[in-house]
Amino acid sequence: MIRIVHRNPLELWGEPSYNERWISISGGIGGPLLIVNDPGLVRHVLVDNARNYKMATVRQNILRPILLDGLLTAEGDVWKRSRKAMAPVFTPRHIFGFAKAMVSATDAFIGRYENARGPVDVARDMTMLTYDILAETLFSGQVAGEPGSFGHEVDRLFETMGRVDPLDILRAPLWMPRLTRIRGRKSLAFFRQIVTDTVKMREARMTAGTDVPEDFLTLLLRAEGPDGLSRAEIEDNIITFIGAGHETTARALGWTIYLLAEASWEREKIEAEIDEVLAREADPVKWLENMPRTRAAFEEAMRLYPPAPSINREPVEDDRYHDLVIKKGTQVLVMPWTLHRHRKLWDAPEAFMPSRFLPENRDTIDRYQYLPFGAGPRVCIGASFAMQEAIIVLALLLKRYRFEKTPGLKPWPVQKLTTQPQGGLPMLVERRQ
């Protein structure tokens, strides 16, 4: 079991996980385990009784060495203060203000497909593109050091540090070295130093009264103070944005493009929608509300391949949900991977059917059976940013290009920090006529 968890935790879940409301395992290697697939119990754990559920030890052992007190890993008063301080940063006004940067970064990137010969790895390309978008919206491209090396170290860091180690499953203390993640330490140190230098560089400009761009970094520095963010917390959250903000959206975009190549009839509808909207609407802020089919395809891709395939919690005190007793210390796994493919919650759960998410059908989906961004107090603060970014990328990309599968392509999903295609997504790209 430990070997499977290290290789790919998604392989653990057998047929009962896709049919039962919950599964309780009392004799697990890492202690008692509860797998949650019931929307009512999801709401109980993540919303109604969220105060009783802390971040699970296994999850913290993986993420905390990288993110420290970023929003994904901070708890208690630190999390409350950080969330309150950052809420104004993620208002619609600021997110809408980043649309033009998203467009320019996407336009600059996708030009590389103009003379593409042979397969391109869409999974890797979407990772690079969303990093470029994040570099523009977070730093306005003003990164200390060599930007190319920064992007490379980001990829290496989350590739090596995001794996589950056997010691994590056994809940070993963090001072015990995880051999599987030693390679990532150099990348982490390099990565943190660049973030520190970039923050200092921007702060010096602000102190000198020099004009600075209205990007995420400037907004975060303005949130610094006794009641806001400390300098260390600003840096931790920048690293969190880079990890959660570009990796998760990139994976969802890659899966969307692959699924549309498999379902050419769906792709044709989306191409027609994109052509019609872009012909009459120049403002990218308006694209999301005017492209319901494109949005539905992206949301359906996140159902089949959720960016975060598991949400791990641990009760602080004994709890009860109807006749289910949840003991203190139990590893509670809210599982978007199985929840999104559950036989009793979805019609044809393995099929790619974007129509599920069209406006006229949304009311049939329980809020707590679909969790691409989580739920409750710790719902993803950047969900609106991610949705805007995804639609802009898909609109500009699919307006100009069409992607086809390479012969025999059947990607195997692997859980690391996100749901990734093992071996990438090699696809053929051609200019649309």
Q: In which residue ranges do the predicted regions lie?
A:
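Cytochrome P450 catalytic-core helices
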Residues: 248-267, 271-273, 384-399
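Conserved cytochrome P450 K-helix/beta-meander segment immediately N-terminal to the heme-binding cysteine loop
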Residues: 334-361
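Cytochrome P450 proximal C-terminal region
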Residues: 17, 106, 110, 126, ...
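Conserved cytochrome P450 K-helix E-x-x-R motif and the immediately C-terminal K′/meander segment
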Residues: 2-23, 193, 197, 281-322
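Cytochrome P450 I-helix active-site segment
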Residues: 99, 103, 152-156, 208-218, ...
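N-terminal membrane-proximal hinge/A-helix region immediately C-terminal to the signal-anchor transmembrane segment
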Residues: 1-81, 96-111, 129, 144-145, ...
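Cytochrome P450 heme-thiolate monooxygenase catalytic core
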Residues: 54-60, 78, 94-251, 269, ...
